[in-house]
């Protein structure tokens, strides 16, 4: 019942969106008109194409220029998410209220803009590019927890994107590499993100944004994408600060939780719930080797009779998506088709860890953190990254989200899997989208969300989150601890919490 009411409220909100008196903007490809939101002055532009549909001969190619359109495009509907598996009820599917999104498609290169300064290029508001997570194989930039009208109300122009996922976003193959002028294949999803940054550089002033003050931020695989962008030479100069959420820090084998020698009185003891693998996330986002990936993909494609690019590109979306699974079942062997970023010598020259340590990482301010019940012990790797930034003359702010999400017992299919301050639980708070969720939020939750939204938007504006939050350094290894009360953080990993 609650989900039905949530869906009705979202539909009603969209139904009330109007293009009455909203500015018509001229951007790359043609003219666009946005629609109003429920927050005064905030306009959203949904489903703006930022590249040509990657279909047919453009499958597994770098993003190509957007196809121009005639007349004024009314941007009142979100674009297609990248093709992915159907999501069944339970866990994250129910938590995020999936089910009302556009059909999944390879035609997915669309972005959305929330702004209070549409048609005012002199405003020069800070810009934030949101990159969604989902293991590089699922998710989209317009899930309900990502609705960004609150960011617009804080005078930040927020852009969210869809990008190619899974086999469509990261496949490598020897013939694709031979076809490429750069001699490599894969990383198409990262190239999509870079194309979105280029789109921002060329077009965001029309929405009141400053192309010279751009923050990139992402969570989980979105954080992994941010890490790749911070290492990639192709993204250099297109962004000016970065936020890494639940993407780990530096990889430290057998890392113990970060602990300061002189923790504040009452600080929670270091610890991790039993059974949680150590340092899982930091390893998860290490790029793959391209030659290994090419050979593995070729084996599967050849088995299916897709022995050249013409056949590979002529195969249906469904065939390509299911191919690895079919191969595994029919052959009795494990077949792997690339599904994540890799070091290729073009988009990515080395791992994030290596770039951080050799000093070639993007020299920008960083925010980096995790949730208490995240996908492994991240605090030590995060502290190590912050120390690394200090050694290189930069700054990084660290945080832990320690608020266990409230539960009224109405969705056991969710809470059986997602407990406490679980992986991704901070997203409702960062976007201040609690109203779209079924959970019984308290006033304290709303207040905490406002603090987090303020910190993130402050960072977008000023490269400093404020709130008395100081950079994490070797001498001052403090993590901002986002919580409601002392009970929220009784299992906190951090040695020196900073409470807002």
Which sequence ranges carry the predicted segments?
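Sec-dependent N-terminal signal peptides
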Residues: 4-13
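Non-catalytic accessory segments of hydrolases
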Residues: 16-187, 211, 372, 441-449, ...
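Mobile gating loops/cap/lid regions near enzyme active sites that modulate substrate access
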Residues: 85-86, 325, 391-500
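Alpha/beta-hydrolase active-site loop
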Residues: 106-108, 182-206, 289-295
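Substrate-access "cap/lid" subdomains that shape
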Residues: 198, 202, 227, 236, ...
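Alpha/beta-hydrolase fold nucleophile elbow
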Residues: 207-219
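A short, hydrophobic beta-strand element of the alpha/beta-hydrolase
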Residues: 216, 243-245
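Glycine-rich nucleophile elbow surrounding the catalytic serine of serine-hydrolase chemistry
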Residues: 218-228
């Amino acid at each position: 019942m609650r989900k039905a009411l949530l869906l009705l409220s979202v539909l009603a909100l969209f139904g009330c969106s109007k293009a009455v008196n909203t500015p018509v903007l001229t951007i790359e490809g043609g003219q666009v008109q946005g629609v109003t939101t429920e927050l005064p002055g905030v306009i959203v532009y949904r489903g703006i194409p930022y590249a040509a549909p990657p279909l047919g001969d453009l499958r597994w190619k770098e993003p190509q220029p957007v196809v121009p359109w005639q007349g004024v495009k009314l941007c009142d509907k979100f674009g297609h998410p990248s093709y992915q598996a159907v999501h069944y009820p339970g866990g994250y599917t129910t938590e995020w209220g999936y089910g009302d999104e556009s059909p999944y498609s390879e035609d997915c290169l669309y972005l959305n803009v929330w702004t209070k300064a549409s048609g005012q290029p002199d405003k020069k508001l800070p810009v934030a590019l949101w990159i969604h997570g989902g293991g590089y194989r699922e998710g989209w930039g317009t899930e309900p927890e990502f609705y960004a009208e609150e960011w617009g109300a804080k005078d930040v122009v927020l852009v969210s994107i869809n990008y190619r996922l899974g086999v469509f976003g990261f496949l490598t193959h020897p013939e694709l590499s031979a076809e490429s002028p750069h001699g490599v294949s894969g990383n198409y999803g990262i190239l999509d993100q870079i194309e979105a940054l280029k789109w921002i550089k060329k077009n965001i002033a029309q929405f009141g944004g400053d192309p010279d003050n751009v923050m990139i931020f992402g969570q989980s695989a979105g954080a992994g994408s941010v890490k790749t962008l911070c290492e990639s030479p192709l993204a250099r100069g297109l962004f000016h600060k970065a936020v890494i959420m639940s993407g780990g820090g530096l990889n430290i084998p057998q890392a113990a939780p970060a602990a300061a020698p002189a923790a504040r009185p009452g600080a929670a003891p270091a610890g991790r719930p039993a059974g949680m693998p150590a340092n899982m996330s930091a390893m998860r986002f290490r790029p793959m080797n391209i030659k290994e990936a090419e050979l593995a993909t070729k084996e599967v494609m050849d088995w299916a009779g897709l022995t050249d690019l013409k056949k590979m590109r002529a195969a249906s979306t469904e065939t390509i998506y299911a191919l690895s699974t079919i191969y595994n079942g029919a052959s009795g062997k494990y077949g792997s088709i690339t599904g994540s970023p890799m070091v290729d010598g073009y988009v990515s020259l080395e791992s994030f860890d290596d770039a951080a340590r050799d000093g070639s990482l993007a020299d920008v301010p960083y925010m980096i953190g995790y949730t208490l019940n995240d996908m492994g012990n991240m605090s030590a790797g995060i502290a190590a990254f912050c120390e690394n930034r200090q050694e290189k003359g930069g700054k990084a702010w660290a945080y832990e989200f320690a608020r266990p999400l409230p539960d009224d017992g109405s969705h056991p299919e969710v809470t059986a899997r997602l407990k406490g301050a679980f992986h991704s639980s901070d997203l409702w708070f960062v976007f201040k989208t609690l109203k779209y969720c079924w959970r019984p939020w308290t006033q304290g939750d709303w207040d905490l969300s406002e603090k987090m939204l303020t910190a993130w938007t402050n960072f977008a504006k000023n490269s400093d989150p404020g709130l008395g939050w100081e950079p994490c350094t070797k001498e001052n290894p403090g993590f901002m601890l986002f919580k409601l009360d002392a009970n929220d953080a009784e299992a906190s990993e951090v040695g020196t919490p900073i409470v807002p």
